[in-house]
Amino acid sequence: MELRIEQLNFEYASHPLFREFKLQLGPGITWLRGENGAGKTTLLKLIGGAIAPHAGRIWLDDIEIHAQPLTYRLHCYYCGGDTPQLPWLTVREVLDMHVSLYAGTDPELLNAELAAFHLLPTLDQPVTTLSLGQHKKMQLALALSLPVALLLIDEPFNGLDVDAVAYLRQQLSAPPRLARQCIVLTSHLEPALPLVGTVQL
């Protein structure tokens, strides 16, 4: 699996973030570093298709994000920690929606990840009743379960307790995952993971 970005341009109002930006990544974990406002989260959203660049192209292997937007997005998952804007759904319904979208998801694996993050008792609660930390754990459980080629995680350790941080590091560092999945993450601290590279913004 290869992520390739060519000639990417993006700016907010009159503040340019990316000019002719290029990047090529393969399997393994890449750490995006940079000061606040450098564009780390924006780059993850651009790669994940949550926002569109003003110019440039992004590929996953031979799938181009604008030519095949749905196919592209079903090969990646963006874990940003944002609260889902679906107040009428339960936690279980939010999870079921993702399982139905991402073909090949193993429900038993998802349940195991939910158990590891102590989320099984919350399944029938409205998703709006989760704390910010629980929302993050729900997204991370999905991130660790979905059979995607590209995993994008914004500040994965923010809001997590010590046990959850240790578990997440263990799961992200598993050799089978590192061999098959391109993982791009931001972190304001050294992530203490087996990195294949660092990108300074």
For the regions a protein language model found, what residue spans apply to each?
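Q-loop/switch helix immediately C-terminal to the Walker
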Residues: 82, 87-103
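Helix-to-loop junction immediately C-terminal to a conserved catalytic motif
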Residues: 48
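Hydrophobic anchor residue at the start of the ABC signature
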Residues: 140
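Conserved ABC ATPase "signature" region
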Residues: 107-122
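ABC-family nucleotide-binding domains
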Residues: 36, 154, 161
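Conserved ABC transporter NBD signature motif
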Residues: 56-72
